[in-house]
Amino acid sequence: MIRGVLRNFRRGAEFIELVDISAEGCGFTSRWPFEVGARVLLGLPGLEPWPGTIVWHEAGQGGVQFDRPLHPGVVSRFAAQIKDAGPSRAHLTPPEKD
């Protein structure tokens, strides 16, 4: 499990669990809802705050699209940690739109 923080300028900081990551974005779980379209800064261990936008959030799961891609080495490091953490809730997908 990789714990992180999503900081929103309106609401402050909320703890999250990172469950999926790519160069373009990440999936997470949280106890608190996030508004789609909200601007956030992602804080992860050893990573400078990374800006992005909430692109979906439902039932405690959500996704962030980064403003700029993460370096492939950073993605590989966090992806390996997620894989090592086990199958918990990895590879979240946004709900289908009706």
Summary of predicted features, one role per range:
Residues 1-98:
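Structured alpha-helical
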